[in-house]
């Protein structure tokens, strides 16, 4: 099994609910290491750039508005099969369909305010981690 890196964003709804620590605990209990982290309030340009692949989709303006509505916590996670493991921890995009005990089942209120983002592939993970972190901001841990 390969050690991978993935990007996770704790979205404005979950930050507002004050569950950052509970989400971090789930990452760590699952064997993921937080190798970079920052809290920031995304600008419109940052949100549009990050979600550029969705620019032509109808939900894009609402997504950008939501992601800029309050602070987010962005982290790079590292571990064995980190991408799939993080997606398993997050649960289905729609919290109503998410398995009990997943982050979205426990902390999300709707498909739009769904608590967390996670990279969906190795290519996305590489691009997304680099979008928020320079190489010297990442602190690999063994």
Swiss-Prot record:
Gene Ontology molecular-function annotations? ATP binding; metal ion binding; nucleoside diphosphate kinase activity
Q: Which cofactor does it need?
A: Mg(2+)
Q: List, alphabetically, the GO terms of the cellular component aspect.
A: cytoplasm
GO biological process terms held by the UniProt record: CTP biosynthetic process; GTP biosynthetic process; UTP biosynthetic process
Q: ATP-binding as a keyword?
A: yes
Cited function = Major role in the synthesis of nucleoside triphosphates other than ATP. The ATP gamma phosphate is transferred to the NDP beta phosphate via a ping-pong mechanism, using a phosphorylated active-site intermediate.
| Species this chain originates from | Hahella chejuensis (strain KCTC 2396)
**According to its UniProt record, which reaction does this protein catalyse?**
a 2'-deoxyribonucleoside 5'-diphosphate + ATP = a 2'-deoxyribonucleoside 5'-triphosphate + ADP; a ribonucleoside 5'-diphosphate + ATP = a ribonucleoside 5'-triphosphate + ADP
The question of whether Cell membrane is a record keyword is answered with: no
What is this protein called in UniProt? Nucleoside diphosphate kinase
Say which family it is in: Belongs to the NDK family.
Assembly and binders: Homotetramer.
Q: Name the catalytic site residues.
A: 117 (pros-phosphohistidine intermediate)
Q: Which PANTHER family match?
A: NUCLEOSIDE DIPHOSPHATE KINASE (PTHR46161), NUCLEOSIDE DIPHOSPHATE KINASE DDB_G0292928-RELATED (PTHR46161:SF3)
Localization per record: Cytoplasm
Binding residues for ATP:
11, 59, 87, 93, 104, 114
Q: Which domain of life is it from?
A: Bacteria
Write the Enzyme Commission number(s) for this entry: 2.7.4.6
UniProt cross-references to HAMAP family, sorted A to Z: NDP_kinase (MF_00451)
Please provide the record's keywords in A-Z order.
ATP-binding, Cytoplasm, Kinase, Magnesium, Metal-binding, Nucleotide metabolism, Nucleotide-binding, Phosphoprotein, Transferase
